[in-house]
Amino acid sequence: MTWICVITLFALASATLGNKVSRVGVLFPKTRNDNECTARGGLKGSCKSLIDCPSVLATLKDSFPVVCSWNGRFQPIVCCPDAIAPPPVTTTAVTVISTKEPKLPRLHISGCGKRKVKIDITTVGRSGSPILPPISTPQNSTGGRGIIAGGVEAKIGAWPWMAAVFVKNFGIGRFHCAGSIISNKYILSAAHAFLIGGRKLTPTRLAVRVGGHYIKRGQEYPVKDVIIHPHYVEKENYNDIAIIELKEELNFTDLVNPICLPDPETVTDPLKDRIVTAAGWGDLDFSGPRSQVLREVSIPVVPVDKCDQAYEKLNTPSLKNGITNNFLCAGLEEGGKDACQGDSGGPLMLVNNTRWIVVGVVSFGHKCAEEGYPGVYSRVASYLDWIAKVTNSLDHAVTN
């Protein structure tokens, strides 16, 4: 390439000598002496043979040099700059794309997760069954099925965030599902309980009772709306979560208080080997009688991969993607303890320093307390962004 440029210079020079008039942009600047010159860019330089000026040789393909003279017809003497001009400084607008996950909201209602009725944290219910047994020795099934299959009756006031949802027909309310209080206006529940046959239950037909131990007691509140997760699809089990908005605000008492939502830091926590508690008024057995009092059961968390292997055997179309990390699974390997029909929408709870947190929403299972099939819950931590949006960050009633 260099020699092509030299030949080009020679051709240009020949044309110049032949016509005696320069017709190209080759400059012959006047200087104080024959050796000094001004190179392109205004740099001071000295006249040298092209071969002896590497900086000019390097730029021949981009621009013609300043020619001082010719040594014969084939050797141009060029203005070789004494110093190389620094490249021009350019500024380019740079868009920085963060690779970090967006910060999840911290949704805490002041005083949430506290039980105002004094209860021994290691024993609950009339039978004194431990709700937080040692992790290394989880509870064994007694063979009987109580809860919510396999549980015990809760002590009055043990779970002040429990809510019972009723559907009214001709003015008569019928128990429909459960939920958990997360603020004075919102109840967390399951989507599948409110979307039936492609239609959402009319809010005016719904009522929520709180503060009751017996299923037919408690304070009743009308429902303003039910917000179903936008990605929930009927007859599938994914994104099975909903929020009930009440027409009137709840009055918090010893028997009515919100449960805490998970901290953002728990989103990826598998809760391995943790003992969790479910509560509700559901069936005492699969297709069995319904409980008339609030019951509870404590069960260990089952790893998602193990849970997925279990449900893969059923080859059910409602789980086309298997059990994902947006679920939590819990139950005894030998069965005997589980949530059951009617417990849908109720909370799966975890205690942390005496503060109770809703980590799951009762979603589905294979029958109830079936051996080898843990209960499956919508993982609340996976939906914190959606909950914050729907509740307008719990209507700003948030404390960090």
UniProtKB/Swiss-Prot annotation:
Any one Gene Ontology molecular-function term assigned to this protein's record: serine-type endopeptidase activity
InterPro entries, alphabetized: CLIP, Peptidase_S1_PA, Peptidase_S1_PA_chymotrypsin, Peptidase_S1A, Ser/Thr_Proteases_Immune/Dev, Trypsin_dom, TRYPSIN_SER
Active site: H192 (charge relay system), D240 (charge relay system), S344 (charge relay system)
Mechanisms controlling activity: Strongly inhibited by alpha2-plasmin inhibitor and DFP. Partially inhibited by benzamidine, leupeptin and PCMB.
Disulfide bond found in the keyword field: yes
GO biological process: hemolymph coagulation; protein processing
Gene Ontology CC entries for this record: extracellular region
Domain (Clip) ranges: 36-80
Propeptide: 104-124
Glycosylation sites: N140, N251, N352
Keywords tagged on the record: Disulfide bond, Glycoprotein, Hemolymph clotting, Hydrolase, Protease, Secreted, Serine protease, Signal, Zymogen
Localization terms from the record: Secreted
Entry EC number(s): 3.4.21.85
Disulfide bonds: C37-C79, C47-C68, C53-C80, C307-C329, C340-C368
Catalytic reactions of this protein: Selective cleavage of 98-Arg-|-Ile-99 bond in Limulus proclotting enzyme to form active clotting enzyme
Top-rank taxon: Eukaryota
Domain note: The clip domain consists of 35-55 residues which are 'knitted' together usually by 3 conserved disulfide bonds forming a clip-like compact structure.
Family, as annotated: Belongs to the peptidase S1 family. CLIP subfamily.
Function per UniProt: This enzyme is closely associated with an endotoxin-sensitive hemolymph coagulation system which may play important roles in both hemostasis and host defense mechanisms. Its active form catalyzes the activation of proclotting enzyme. Does not activate the mammalian coagulation factors factor IX, factor X, prothrombin, plasminogen, protein C or prekallikrein. Does not hydrolyze fibrinogen. Does not catalyze the activation of factor C or coagulogen.
Protein name: Clotting factor B
Organism, scientific name: Tachypleus tridentatus
